[in-house]
Amino acid sequence: MASKKGDPEELYVRQEKIGKGSFGEVFKGINKKTNETIAIKTIDLEDAEDEIEDIQQEINVLSQCESPFVTKYFGSFLKGSKLWIIMEYLAGGSVLDLMKPGPFDEGYIAIILRELLKGLEYLHSEGKIHRDIKAANVLLSASGDVKLADFGVSGQLTDQMTKRNTFVGTPFWMAPEVIKQTGYDSKADIWSMGITALEMAKGEPPRADLHPMRALFLIPKDPPPTLEGNFSKGFKEFCALCLNKDPNQRPTAKDLLKHKFIKAAKKTSSLTDLIERRQKWLQLNGNNADDENDDLDRDAKSNEEDFGWEFPTIKQKSPVAVQEQQQTPQKPTVVSTPIKEQQQQQQPTPVTTPQQPVTTTTTTPTTETKVRSLSNSSQTTPVKTTVAATTAPATTPASNAPTSTTPNGAAVTQQQAPRASALTSVIYPVLSKLLKNTSDENVINALAQLKMAFDNAEKAKPGITHSLIAQIIETLKR
């Protein structure tokens, strides 16, 4: 997506900060020409070098969406290393903001879910998956219109790719198949919407009292959460349909719009009651009450720091990039290379390392180079190749890969089974963080040996890392 030239401050007046979105801060603003109120997301690309691909993904998705149920995108501007993304201003705030005074009555929940389903029906019909549905990413206008926001981790499904394998989302809202990396499709959004329904009814998602890492182990293992309490049979049934652990048994957004609980929902104008409720709550508690650290996402982020996780939203490269290897890890280096569209993308070149771990220096493009890639046409996408606590990918001849057929008859090459998510999503990030924070050669060598030990153990007995971490968590609980 091309960014516009010129100084955005000549076109817009940036006013007070109104929140934080994926990658940056969000301000209220005014279009000088039309006097229209808009939202301005500002991102310092020098501070977000590793997220440039994801930022461009959000811009690409927003620019392609034309729906009354998705936040409008008006354009983006580069000023030095600062990126301005101009979007529709939604004065009602997020559903999470509106929940600060307390959970919602189910009548309001039904309205929000209906509008959310309309947004998902549109996205899914366009072959897109949101992948981060939660109350914080659902916004309201002053008149009660409901819109989906925050597309930083959205995915695109094509005829040649019926299921994705990337590990993304926010832990408490993640579908079991996403965590297990068995491949997923738009039904993952339906699960997350079911969790969001429970969040609105109870004030927080299931397992919110647990560390996010423990939640990741329990979600695929335990029975699905249910809506308990004084709620209607229709609402409980709706949640149960969304939270079926078998994605093939979950209804589509289109089907759920026909559910009796949704069909009985009132007009969106009723949601202005929630906006007024929050305004009264702010008057009683002071405007600073909105800034308190009671956001579950922020709590999760502070809890995870000891484990080397990056919450609230996780995005991991496709498991294909972490296939079995026999090579020695290096000090982490991130290389960002602009390449043509994904159909021209080649497998990363395997990295040859010496027998003993050493610290290597790799010339990396500057932030300025990455920033320029955002200004180019949509034919160029910056892609990150990470040489970190992962090893180089093994190349598998396409001719040996099993194939299947999509419903429309297109041949699909199935990806090899991904490595254990515990190894690629827990051990590697922790080792990478430890490696980044030390210059002691003894520590570096020890970490390299530790990683090799995990690699060898996982190769000898797939899933052993998951079992080990699960046992550690059980021990710590005692």
From Swiss-Prot:
Q: Posttranslational modification, per the record?
A: Autophosphorylated.
Listed Polar residues bias regions? 323-340
List, as start-end ranges, the regions of compositional bias called Low complexity.
Answer: 341-368, 380-408
Residues binding ATP, per UniProt: I18, G19, K20, G21, S22, F23, G24, E25, V26, K41
Changes seen on gene knockout: Defects in cytokinesis, leading to multinucleated cells caused by failure to sever the final connecting bridge between the 2 daughter cells. Cells also display defects in development and directed slug movement.
Give me the Gene Ontology terms describing cellular component: actin cytoskeleton; centrosome; cleavage furrow; cytoplasm; cytosol; mitotic spindle; nucleus
EC number(s) on file: 2.7.11.1
> Cofactor(s) for this protein?
Mg(2+); Mn(2+)
Q: Which cysteines are joined by disulfide bonds?
A: none
Judged by the first EC level, this protein's enzyme class is: transferase
Q: Which GO terms describe its biological process?
A: cell division; hippo signaling; hyperosmotic response; intracellular signal transduction; positive regulation of cell division; positive regulation of mitotic cytokinetic process; protein phosphorylation; regulation of actin cytoskeleton organization
Lipid metabolism as a keyword of this entry, yes or no, is: no
Q: What is this protein called?
A: Serine/threonine-protein kinase svkA
The organism is Dictyostelium discoideum (Social amoeba)
**Phylogenetic classification of the source organism:** Eukaryota, Amoebozoa, Evosea, Eumycetozoa, Dictyostelia
Per UniProt, what is the name of the gene that codes for the protein in this document? svkA
